[in-house]
Amino acid sequence: NVAIGDEAGTAITTGDNNVAIGYTALDANTTGANNTAVGYASLGANTTGTPNTAVGRSALGANTTGGGNTAVGDLALGNNTTADGNTAVGRNSMNVNTEGHSNSALGDTALYRNTTGDSNTAVGFQALDHNTTADSNTAVGASALTANTTGATNVAVGDTALDANTTGSHNVALGVSALGANTTADDNVAVGRSALAAN
């Protein structure tokens, strides 16, 4: 194990191959192994979770037993506790996530409010920002599916595509502002800039 910084890795007992750099980085870890924490309080609450990578202030800071997570950015996956297999890159990306598994978020506040939703992909500033419990959504583009809360299995590609959608499911929007006004309707397909924008 390698620990650099005040209180970094102070509780490690049998955990192996950990790297903790920064004040209180990995400071609660006991048996967790193969973790990398770089930044103030990164992976600070981790006890047995393995393997995780956290780079940034409080990245994966609340994680206790979750494993296979990667968080890069200020507060990325900051509230994750037990969830596995998430990747969050960007400031506040997936910050509220607690138990959602197998999600990928790339961009400032992407999937920010996700708590228990699984298998979502968000790429872009505020993509899927309000998603909480919904599963299997794909959003690519700034503010794509940004208002979505519980709508599932939607695909939005393009800036503000399906950006007003809240509970609608099984929609496909390809193009800037495609299906932009849709909120609760299901099973729509829109291809092209502003296609079905008023739907």
State each model region's role:
Residues 1-199:
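Glycine- and small/polar-enriched repetitive beta-structure motifs of secreted/surface proteins
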